[in-house]
Amino acid sequence: MPRKGPVAKRDVLPDPMYNSKLVTRLINKMMVDGKKGKSQTILYNAFDIVNERTGKEPMEVFEQALKNIMPVLEVRARRVGGANYQVPVEVRPERRTTLGLRWLVNYARLRGEKTMEERLANEILDAANNAGASVKKREDTHKMAEANKAFAHYRW
């Protein structure tokens, strides 16, 4: 066991364009091989596409999309008497945001559009309208938690 104690939580700086820490976290989540500038460009272009298609402020659409993706419940494996049970637990707020951003980026990458900007913009728009693969992932997670409700008393 390490003796140094818990690692201090690093705070991210808000991005220059929207002055939002959430946007910075999304940029960092999308970043590949340390190319933050490229990630920033992709996100801002995706936000331009969102603005073009909806006529709304892209931050509002993004926040709505993220709210529709973030899970409230998830299942965690708990070993009791030689058997593994999937125990439903509430998701902490920080983890909710992290999972929401992760699912948004992962399912945007799996889409079929030509550029990442289009993929991300379409995934954000779908999620804002309660559709798309990332929202389906949240629904599946909630279904798993609901199905294993009987094991809720194993919570720790």
Swiss-Prot record:
<keyword id="KW-0689">Ribosomal protein</keyword>
<dbReference type="GO" id="GO:0000028">
    <property type="term" value="P:ribosomal small subunit assembly"/>
</dbReference>
<dbReference type="InterPro" id="IPR020606">
    <property type="entry name" value="Ribosomal_uS7_CS"/>
</dbReference>
<keyword id="KW-0820">tRNA-binding</keyword>
<comment type="similarity">
    <text>Belongs to the universal ribosomal protein uS7 family.</text>
</comment>
<dbReference type="GO" id="GO:0003735">
    <property type="term" value="F:structural constituent of ribosome"/>
</dbReference>
<dbReference type="Pfam" id="PF00177">
    <property type="entry name" value="Ribosomal_S7"/>
</dbReference>
<dbReference type="InterPro" id="IPR036823">
    <property type="entry name" value="Ribosomal_uS7_dom_sf"/>
</dbReference>
<dbReference type="GO" id="GO:0005840">
    <property type="term" value="C:ribosome"/>
</dbReference>
<keyword id="KW-0694">RNA-binding</keyword>
<keyword id="KW-0699">rRNA-binding</keyword>
<keyword id="KW-0687">Ribonucleoprotein</keyword>
<dbReference type="GO" id="GO:0000049">
    <property type="term" value="F:tRNA binding"/>
</dbReference>
<comment type="subunit">
    <text>Part of the 30S ribosomal subunit. Contacts proteins S9 and S11.</text>
</comment>
<protein>
    <recommendedName>
        <fullName>Small ribosomal subunit protein uS7</fullName>
    </recommendedName>
</protein>
<dbReference type="GO" id="GO:0003729">
    <property type="term" value="F:mRNA binding"/>
</dbReference>
<dbReference type="InterPro" id="IPR005717">
    <property type="entry name" value="Ribosomal_uS7_bac/org-type"/>
</dbReference>
<dbReference type="GO" id="GO:0022627">
    <property type="term" value="C:cytosolic small ribosomal subunit"/>
</dbReference>
<dbReference type="GO" id="GO:0019843">
    <property type="term" value="F:rRNA binding"/>
</dbReference>
<dbReference type="InterPro" id="IPR000235">
    <property type="entry name" value="Ribosomal_uS7"/>
</dbReference>
<dbReference type="GO" id="GO:0006412">
    <property type="term" value="P:translation"/>
</dbReference>
<dbReference type="InterPro" id="IPR023798">
    <property type="entry name" value="Ribosomal_uS7_dom"/>
</dbReference>
<comment type="function">
    <text>One of the primary rRNA binding proteins, it binds directly to 16S rRNA where it nucleates assembly of the head domain of the 30S subunit. Is located at the subunit interface close to the decoding center, probably blocks exit of the E-site tRNA.</text>
</comment>
